[in-house]
Amino acid sequence: MAPSLFLQVSSAKVPTVSANNPLLQSYDLPPFSAIRAEHVQPAIEQILADNRVAIEGILQSQGKNPTWAGLVLAMDELNDRLGAAWSPVSHLNAVCNSAELREAYEACLPALSAYSTEMGQNRALFQAFEALANSPEAAGFDVAQKTILEHSLRDFRLSGIDLPPEQQKRYAEVQSKLSELGSKFSNQLLDATQAWTKHVTDEATLAGLTDSAKAQMAAAAQAKGLDGWLITLEFPSYYAVMTYAHDRALREEVYAAYCTRASDQGPNAGKNDNGPVMEQILDLRQELAQLLGYASFSELSLATKMAESSDQVLSFLRDLAKRSKPFAAQDLQQLKAYAAEQGCADLQSWDSGFYGEKLREQRYSVSQEALRAYFPIDKVLGGLFAIVQRLYGIEIAEQKGFDTWHPDVRLFEIKENGQHVGRFFFDLYARANKRGGAWMDGARDRRRTVDGVLQSPVANLVCNFTPADSGKPALLTHDEVTTLFHEFGHGLHHLLTRVEHAGVSGINGVAWDAVELPSQFMENWCWEPEGLALISGHYETGEPLPQDLLEKMLAAKNFQSGLMMVRQLEFSLFDFELHATHGDGRSVAQVLEGVRDEVSVMRPPAYNRFPNSFAHIFAGGYAAGYYSYKWAEVLSADAFSKFEEDGVLNAETGRAFREAILARGGSQAPMVLFVDFRGRAPSIDALLRHSGLSEDAAA
């Protein structure tokens, strides 16, 4: 739990000793194309050394009577310089992974972890922050400044500031090892994903697949110097087989390879096995929690979250499961009945996607593939920008002539009343050596520097969509459109902040179980006729989504929503239970089985090793926090219900949401911000209604 105070990821303007290392230069946007693996470690070591010297100077001048500018802003400058170098390295490691860059990245992790712990356990620094918090000056601080001091003192305690020296030393060792293991988990998953392919030479094997999916597979084969088609475990390829392939044996083969990645099972059993890595991570997290006086890592994780206790989280998840499970059982029964009609009497995990899509097509006469033609990327982006321009009063324009890490990357600028607000990069398409999934990271924070200059924010928005092929633009499925809106919601949270203090601007300082509110909130416009009118248009003719197709799509919105809900609750409960009960003698697999007994309606085969690829909790920020998606969905659904009342493109309500939620970042508790916008505490009713799981839906 590195203190947020000490590793803000941002940009910098501190002079440097090296004229040749791009990571040690001052820059507006990172010089991505100039960054080499050999630059990484020397730059990070130099900055850490410089920062240590600078902190000694800060403590000498601020030890007795600290001031905001002399202490907090001075520390911001140091954090910013470190972030300016580390952010592009971490980003490139995720989107352009290579053996050399990976080695350089990993070589820095122990030093960064040690520095973070050292800062968090620096008693003189802690005392300076404590003195500032108790000073007469602090009485006049604004709410954001007070929150930063409160978070800082909390983070010192969560870094072991109160521990005796031996335990502090052990804390540092555990944090360093956890940093290394998280990276190892991620690397082994990426390597396992890349390690399996299936070369197909008979097109009949691919019966049922769409032309676009086959074109991608042909391109993948060509890239390896092969004829025919190459199936990979990158998500667009996997999804295409599981959803459309008529060949049941092919579906089973690809499913088995995908769900056993980085495990002791499947075609590459024992290679890149994340099983031992998970056990080590769980042991160390439990040790960390106990060092800091918490019963479990779940309890420790809640120290920085909106939820008040483990019991509250578990009650919330179990209540949702109880409400959802009857709907899920009904969904599964209908799917099994349909599959049996089609000649599949024993529905298995590799059949559910295929028959689910066929049942959706039969019931609603709509398929993801038919919809794809209406969502060319530029139309979707134009509509997305039009929606947020109308809601939030901003302008978005594409920029040219910038340094990049790949030719597909695009850069956009946000302005308000002609004034620069921030910029964001889009890296939208799947490719080799790029981490799977979709994410936003804040590449630079909005903040007022020690010189009084306002630094504007920058965000990286990354997805893994199917790229353009054979002269067509990239065409998105509606699911991909929703993913784009989700990540853009995160981006707006980071970019539209009005807070000028780095510690709580944008997504900084936001409780993890509230951070998904703006992202899940944005998804709603993908399901509203007014939103769809702006983001859809046939890629050849430009004609809007036909009314009948629109109606079918909206009717199909909650198709199998019970199954989808219990699947997410399975992930959430598994994660929380795993961290709450570690050490009770149960294995990871046994915890998962227990959760499935409680909430699941369909069991995967015994060889399934889903946890081995659950990067969110083993290599991301969601450990004992995956429940945050559902927790924040209650907030986002209820917030959106205000737009349902006022009009989904109502500018006044949009401005109110911006000012209450987006503009204020982590400067106040999420519940305070929510109540400011909604006028009351959140209710679960909107989530149940939006998901088709309310009593009305059952009637």
Which functions belong to the PLM regions below?
Residues T466-F485:
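Short pre-active-site segment immediately N-terminal to the catalytic Zn-binding motif
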Residues L5-V9, K13-L209, F643:
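N-terminal helix-rich structural modules
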Residues D80-H91, E150, R154, A256, ...:
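Short, hydrophobic/amphipathic alpha-helical patches that form generic packing surfaces
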Residues A49, V53, G57-K64, W68, ...:
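Intrinsically disordered or highly flexible coil/loop and linker segments, enriched in small
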Residues V9, P15, S456-V458, H478:
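Alpha-helical segments
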Residues F6-V9, V14-H39, Q46, P66, ...:
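C-terminal, non-catalytic "cap/extension" segments appended to globular domains
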Residues A144, I148-E150, K177-E180, N187, ...:
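Active-site-proximal, well-structured secondary-structure segments within enzyme catalytic domains
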Residues L24-H39, V89-C108, E130-E173, T232-P276, ...:
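Short His/Asp/Glu-rich catalytic/ion-coordination signatures at enzyme active sites or charged loops
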